[in-house]
């Protein structure tokens, strides 16, 4: 008899994520603004988490790259160059995304001011991210099991494809909705005059204006990548169902904290957070089901 699983964990885990997100969307549809009034309050620790919290999610890119690398190398030397190329690309992706989303804070940390400071300081800020991700491929190389190279390759490919698709779908939906952010609304004399629920969409109003890119939450797309952690746990040398469940619990806690912080820091409403999580989770479910065997 087969034990049906999704993303290396029992289906009940997927049902739990989907149920919580739907409940959040329903509650947010009625009380989005009131929830933000009650919870939104910028703090230093919230700002720190907003800057560096995505680091853990982006670690998944070089980890996925190492999955593919180790699987291809196991298949033979003829794949070694391809493996190295993919590993470098995935490492670069983590560094690029981190620098793109949070680089301004790091450059500020190093005292860089565009047009005034030495360009060398900007290079150092890139090096900061390069160093932060350096441990990932080395550790993953040691702990991943290459006895089934096809599973390794498909696991890494699923995470990469799902991550890239999620990011682009999210960017497209932000333009479709063009929903004003709470942090923008509270700068107005009458915040409710421009408040819109998630279904009250005004396509392409946002343009390049980030103040109108509240729905769905892009940061929750990043955070929800952590739900693929059990997929990586499932290719460990000493893997077990218990470890997969532990990874799922860790991912869930991370996503909840991240989601709360997005509201707390005035960036999103509850429905934005839940939609960002749900959309990303569905994409990862679909891609992993297409790439990886879901029965064992």
Predicted regions and their residues:
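Membrane-embedded catalytic cores of phosphoryl/pyrophosphoryl-handling enzymes
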Residues: 2-18, 196-296
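N-terminal transmembrane-helix/juxtamembrane module of multi-pass inner/ER membrane proteins
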Residues: 2-130, 177
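Alpha-helical transmembrane segments of integral membrane proteins
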Residues: 11-20, 83-87, 125-129, 150, ...
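Alpha-helical transmembrane segments in multi-pass membrane proteins
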Residues: 24, 158-162, 166, 170, ...
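Alpha-helical transmembrane segments of multi-pass membrane proteins
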Residues: 25-28, 95-96, 163-170, 254-258
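Membrane-water interface at transmembrane helix exits
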Residues: 27, 32, 36, 40, ...
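Membrane-interface loops
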Residues: 34, 97-118, 140-246
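Hydrophobic cores of alpha-helical transmembrane segments in multi-pass inner/ER membrane proteins
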Residues: 56-70, 126-140, 224-228, 277-294
